[in-house]
């Protein structure tokens, strides 16, 4: 007889933060999964939720500036609200979340905010079909150069406020699968501050943004002076671009935009 209940491993929202000496803010450079817990490791912390069927053991190695973690099951589920899960992990360089299941998640806001040194993050397996909030998800992740979110399902998202704000080194952004029909807030979605690094050249989409429910889109491209639409359209002062520029560039038909159609 089969068991109708599938056992699972679920991590605490602030699990990794609770392990590092400065709660992630100033020390952790790497977060790595291992196959076992070494016998000589001290200060092992459990970072699973109360409802998790399996333990997740984690510890911090000061010599390697690394959080190591171990769990029996391959797949680790995230809880529904992971607001700020890696918020202010300012020294974190890379992160592989390919074994994490995000199918229950509704809130991804501030997930990587102020991950200043983060250069790459693998989100290829992320299930975002239930997510409603992506506010400031990558804000100030300023070393990421390329970000491919073409697998993201955004049908239920209502808040994209400052989602990619101040990603200084971002050169290309692929959001070709984005569905924005329910989004109400896109304030400073792609913007940056005056006087900071400006690298963003292309934003790839499959279709114009659906802005039928959009309420607020203040300065979505502020200070993005290198950004060009697919046919070269731009404004001398990107701050003047309003929500009508959230579309594929089509100047021949009087419809300039800051997006490039993905070929």
Where are these regions (language model features)?
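Negatively charged
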Residues: 1-263
